[in-house]
Each structure stands twice: as structure tokens, then as C-alpha cells.
């Protein structure tokens, strides 16, 4: 049996890492202009400065798959806790590094080089962070509460972005432009380091996930089991990898469309004031927190597959409607358009952390999820702002981002409807059930075939 209260503490300790990742993401986005002035001052063109700044930002996405491979292997071999402790240390250090870096005027070309190294370190550590957090929470939560607890990781995402927005807004109204450009921009990054240290303090108190410990005991009984490489992993689990890749894709395309692309879209295309845009996006994210909690509970009751399809179906039908409302340039209708996207994004925020780890067996779960997740994010999620802005600039059609989102949602709907099997309230593949009450324990004792529902599938895939 697992302790429900300990599971909640686990969500908080792991969610802080996710909050820190998106706190950094938000800071870099909001402070991009100031960062470009400090680290690329030798570039005469302001637009080119921003290009270099965002190119440095994009480097992190290229390193995520490598981090996923390295930390995934470590996490499956040596445990989930050691990886989560390591990644948050690296994230805290890289955040501190950005906050204390000398500018180009002080050390010349070494300034952008060191900024690039800090972003490389962030990307590498992030590659193991989020997948590890999902795995750890899923393995530590009662099966019947996996989605409602797992969505706490995405609450961390929203909270980190909201905190970055509020902090940058506070600096803008409390400091002069000269102060902000000179030293004020460093404050949020220094505060981010303390957030990371607090997360490290909480994570050091965590125990290893019970499911991983059970797997290690089983491994001692079967010491001759051969290690599974990446190609063997693909061979045995290609269907699960496809479903996971597509799920991560439609989740992150929607996520980056709302969080990364919409601010610049509303300013550049819809011609809204920058401050108004920031406040609007922040308010929508605040609304998304209770929505994610609600959909997490619903997913535990009716199954995550149905909640996936609600989100996908809604975006297929209403993405164009949402972007069309934004074209009216009325603050009310623009807000409704953004809220529509945020509402359906909440269905993914609620279900992804608790569902993605269930697609793989315990002995390969960390590396399979880390590699698949980060490759999908790097190829499709992180490129969403670039693709959306390219579509608008080349077609002169402000609705093309909606068409892109619709196409991705249609693909997701087909894959989830045909290939995904709901695992809500079921035990994780390769493990015994996680229960937090006597009633469930007695049920599985009387119905062992329900407890080990995955056994037949595993026997067909592997020989032990």
C-alpha cells in the first residue's frame, strides 16, 4: 500500500522542478529584448539581436533528447531519485549562471558564449527532469488518483510561468528602464536559484519510488535479464512509442502555441498592447489551474482516453473559431478566443503526467519516456512558434496557426482513438497495483487477473 499524504508531498517536491523550468522559460521570453541588448550589443540590428537571443534559447531544445537518453539510462539503472536530485542541481546552477554573467561590454565575445553554455546546461538537465518527475509521481501515487495527483506537475508549469510574468511586471513598474537594463533583469534569475535550492531540499527527503524498488527486487531474482538498448526498445515497444510521441506532440504544440506564440501573435498581428497581452495570458493561466485539477479528477473516473478525445475534438472544432475571435481585436473577444485554447489545453495538462508513464514497463519506463518525450518536444513542440510565425508571414493569413493546430489535433485524435488503451485506475505496466486503502487491496487479492492485466501483453513481447 502507498500513503496518499506522502504521494502529495512527492507531487510538491517534483512539481517545483517543473515550476523552475517554466519560470526560466517565462523569464527568458519576457526579458529577451533586455538580454539581447546585454549579450549581443555588438549587433547593430535590433531584430537580429533578438534572433541571436532566441537562437540561444532554442539550443536548449536540441540538448533535451541527449539529456533524456543519459538521464533515462541512469534513472532505469540506478533509480529515479538520484536523477531528480541531479537535474534540479544543474537547473539551479544554470539559472544562477545566467543571473551573474558579465555582459558583452564587460568581457566581449565570452558573454554570449557563456550564455550559450548556461542554456546548454539547462536543456541537458531538462531532458531528464520532466520525464523523471512524471515517472516518479506515477510510481508513487495510488492508481485511482494517478491523474489527479499527476496534474500537479502541470500546476507547477503554470505556476512557474505565472510567477515569471508577475515578477517581470513588478520590476517594470518599480524600476526605471536604465535600472532594469543594467541590473534589474538579473533579480528574477537569482531568485530562481533559490527556488531550485528549495526543491533540492525537498527532493533529498524523498524515498525511492516503491514500484522501482519492487522492480529491483524482481531483477535480483532474474539476474540474467539482458539490458535493453535503444533499438531493442523501439523494436518491442514501437506502438507505445508512436502513441507517446503523438500525444506529446499535440500536447506541446498546443502548449507552446498558447504560452510561447500567442504573446507575440497578439502584439504583432492583433496589435494589442504588450502589457495587456501579458496580463491576459497570465489570467488565462490562473483560470487553467482549477480546470486542470477538475479534468484530472474526471480522468481518474472516466479514463484519460475520453479526456484526451474531449480536448482533441474541441480543438478540431474550435481552433479556427478561437483565432477568428481574436481577429475582431476587441479585448473581450480576444480573451474568449485565448480562453477557448486554454480550456482545451487544460485537458492535456490534467492527463499527460499521469498517463504517459503508463505506456511503458517499469524496467524501461524512464528511458523510453525521456527519449520519446524530448524528441517529440524538440521536433514539434519547441518549433511551434517558428512554424506558426512562418505560416503567417508567408501566407499573410492570420488564421494559419489555427489550421496547423487543427491538423495536429486531427492526427492526435486518430492515433488516440485507434491505438491508445485507457489505463486510469489500473496498475502500471510491469508492477503490482498501488493502492491506498484496504478495500482496493482486498479486491486485487480476489481478482489477481485485474491486478496483473498487463502480463499477457508483456509475455507476448519479451521472453523472461
Swiss-Prot record:
MF terms (GO), sorted A to Z? symporter activity
Query: Is this entry keyworded Transit peptide?
Result: no
Q: Which GO terms describe its cellular component?
A: plasma membrane
Q: Do you know which InterPro entries this protein is assigned to?
A: H+-coupled_symporters (IPR051084), MFS_dom (IPR020846), MFS_sugar_transport-like (IPR005828), MFS_trans_sf (IPR036259), Sugar_transporter_CS (IPR005829)
Signal sequence coordinates: none
Main location group: membrane
Instruction: Quote any Pfam family the record assigns.
Output: Sugar_tr
Q: How does it sit in the membrane?
A: Multi-pass membrane protein
Q: Supply the SUPFAM superfamilies for this chain.
A: MFS general substrate transporter
Q: Which residue stretches, if any, does this entry annotate as coiled coil? A: none
Q: Does the keyword Membrane apply?
A: yes
Q: Where in the cell is it found?
A: Cell membrane
Transmembrane residue ranges: 15-35, 54-74, 82-102, 107-127, 155-175, 182-202, 241-261, 276-296, 307-327, 328-348, 368-388, 399-419
Q: Which UniProt keywords apply?
A: Cell membrane, Membrane, Symport, Transmembrane, Transmembrane helix, Transport
Free-text function comment from the UniProt entry = May be a proton symporter involved in the uptake of osmolytes such as proline and glycine betaine.
Q: Which family does it belong to?
A: Belongs to the major facilitator superfamily. Metabolite:H+ Symporter (MHS) family (TC 2.A.1.6) family.
Designated name of the protein: Putative proline/betaine transporter
Which species expresses this protein natively? Answer: Staphylococcus epidermidis (strain ATCC 35984 / DSM 28319 / BCRC 17069 / CCUG 31568 / BM 3577 / RP62A)
Q: What is the lineage of its organism?
A: Bacteria, Bacillati, Bacillota, Bacilli, Bacillales
Amino acid at each position: 500500500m502507498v500513503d496518499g499524504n506522502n504521494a502529495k508531498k512527492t507531487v510538491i517536491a517534483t512539481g517545483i522542478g517543473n515550476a523552475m523550468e517554466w519560470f526560466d522559460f517565462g523569464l527568458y521570453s519576457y526579458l529577451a529584448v533586455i538580454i539581447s541588448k546585454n549579450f549581443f550589443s555588438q549587433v547593430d540590428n535590433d531584430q537580429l539581436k533578438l534572433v541571436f537571443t532566441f537562437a540561444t534559447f532554442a539550443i536548449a531544445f536540441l540538448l533535451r533528447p541527449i539529456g533524456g537518453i543519459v538521464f533515462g539510462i541512469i534513472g532505469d539503472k540506478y533509480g529515479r531519485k538520484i536523477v531528480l536530485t541531479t537535474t534540479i542541481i544543474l537547473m539551479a546552477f544554470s539559472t544562477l549562471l545566467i543571473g551573474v554573467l558579465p555582459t558583452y561590454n564587460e568581457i566581449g565575445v565570452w558573454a554570449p558564449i557563456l550564455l550559450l553554455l548556461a542554456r546548454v546546461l539547462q536543456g541537458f538537465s531538462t531532458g531528464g527532469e520532466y520525464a523523471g518527475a512524471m515517472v516518479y509521481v506515477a510510481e508513487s501515487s495510488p492508481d485511482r488518483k494517478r491523474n489527479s495527483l499527476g496534474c500537479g506537475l502541470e500546476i507547477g508549469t503554470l505556476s512557474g510561468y505565472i510567477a515569471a510574468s508577475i515578477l517581470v511586471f513588478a520590476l517594470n513598474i518599480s524600476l526605471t528602464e536604465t535600472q532594469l537594463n543594467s541590473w534589474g533583469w538579473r533579480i528574477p534569475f537569482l531568485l530562481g536559484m533559490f527556488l531550485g535550492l528549495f526543491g533540492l531540499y525537498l527532493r533529498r527527503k524523498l524515498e525511492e519510488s516503491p514500484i522501482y524498488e519492487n522492480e529491483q527486487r524482481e531483477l535480483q531474482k532474474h539476474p540474467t535479464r539482458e539490458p535493453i538498448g535503444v533499438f531493442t526498445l523501439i523494436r518491442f515497444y514501437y506502438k507505445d512509442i508512436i502513441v507517446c510521441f503523438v500525444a506529446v506532440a499535440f500536447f506541446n504544440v498546443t502548449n507552446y502555441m498558447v504560452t510561447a506564440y500567442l504573446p507575440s501573435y497578439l502584439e504583432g498581428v492583433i496589435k494589442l498592447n504588450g502589457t495587456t497581452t501579458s496580463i491576459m495570458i497570465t489570467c488565462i493561466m490562473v483560470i487553467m489551474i482549477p480546470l486542470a485539477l477538475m479534468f484530472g479528477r474526471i480522468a481518474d473516473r472516466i479514463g484519460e482516453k475520453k479526456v484526451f478525445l474531449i480536448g482533441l475534438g474541441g480543438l478540431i472544432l474550435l481552433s479556427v473559431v478561437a483565432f477568428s475571435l481574436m481577429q475582431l481585436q476587441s479585448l473581450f473577444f480576444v480573451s474568449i478566443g485565448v480562453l477557448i485554447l486554454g480550456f482545451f489545453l487544460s485537458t492535456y495538462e490534467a492527463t499527460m503526467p499521469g498517463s504517459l508513464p503508463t505506456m511503458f514497463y517499469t524496467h524501461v519506463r524512464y528511458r523510453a519516456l525521456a527519449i520519446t518525450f524530448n524528441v517529440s518536444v524538440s521536433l514539434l513542440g519547441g518549433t511551434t512558434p517558428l512554424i506558426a510565425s512562418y505560416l503567417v508571414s508567408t501566407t499573410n493569413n492570420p488564421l494559419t496557426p489555427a489550421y496547423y493546430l487543427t491538423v495536429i489535433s486531427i492526427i492526435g485524435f486518430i492515433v488516440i482513438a485507434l491505438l491508445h488503451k485507457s489505463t486510469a485506475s489500473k496498475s502500471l505496466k510491469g508492477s503490482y497495483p498501488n493502492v491506498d486503502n484496504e478495500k482496493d487491496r482486498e479486491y486485487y487479492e480476489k481478482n489477481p487477473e485485474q491486478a496483473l492485466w498487463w502480463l499477457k501483453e508483456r509475455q507476448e513481447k519479451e521472453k523472461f
